[in-house]
Amino acid sequence: MNIVWDSENYKNDFNFVPDYGESVAELLTVEKGGKVMDLGCGTGALIPTLVNKGYKVTGVDASDNMLEIARKNNPDVEFIKKDASKLDFNNRFDGVFSNAVFHWIDDQNGLLKGINNALKTSGQLVCEFGGKGCAETVHSELERLFAKRGLKYKRTFYFPTIGEYMPLVEKNGFKVTYAVLFDRKTYLKGDLISWINMFDKAPFEGVDEEVADEIKKEAQENLKTVLCEDGKWFVDYVRLRFKGVKVL
């Protein structure tokens, strides 16, 4: 999916994304000195974590806005602009790390095939992304409000179960050594509308701006008793975290 990110807003107001990625990086057991790709590195917030583990890191992202910040914050690290589903590396990396990226990718087979080709034999893929039911309270309410106005709410993301996704990982040459699907109540710095504006823009494309604003405000008002505690908003995230080792 082609997304134009507000990189500064992402870095300042949605830093929970890289914060949660710290624990994902712990699954990576590549030896020190190994080459690791941070796939969908964004602003490069997790690059220091990987560098501190002793890895030679290459950040890969499709967003110019994100890479501009990543390069500024990590001047000694190699960054490459590339679509995650069109990787053309060959036998280059000992590990691939990815946090909060896979659910944005349309071509999952292309994504996993490219990662497999990029890895050396026995190379590790460590990843976390949205799983089945992620932010469902928000998406269901928006879907209802769209339908109320005769509009179709397009779910432009991919939130699979373990049972749906792990066979795909195995089909693309990996042995799955760890997989878990879990709930993560995720608190926001701002309100629900700010979250929608950052992460759920696609369904509103082509919708009259006044109507879009009306839907967002109504959704926030309707969900206030469900997703707001003591004035602090949260979203009902579900995450799928796994580790795979290249065997083919």
Which positions does each model-derived feature cover?
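Class I SAM-dependent methyltransferase SAM/SAH-binding core
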Residues: M37-L39, T43-K86
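A short SAM/SAH-binding and catalytic strip from SAM-dependent methyltransferases
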Residues: G95-Q108
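Short alpha-helix
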Residues: Y158-N172
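A short acidic, Gly/Pro-enriched loop at the edge of an enzyme's catalytic core
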Residues: S85-V96
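Conserved class I S-adenosyl-L-methionine
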Residues: M1-G34, A45-T49, M66-I69, N73, Q124-K148
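C-terminal helical/coil "lid" or tail adjacent to the Rossmann-like core of SAM-dependent
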Residues: T177-D230
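A short glycine-rich, Lys/Arg-flanked "PGG" loop and its adjoining helix->strand segment in the class I
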Residues: N109-Q124
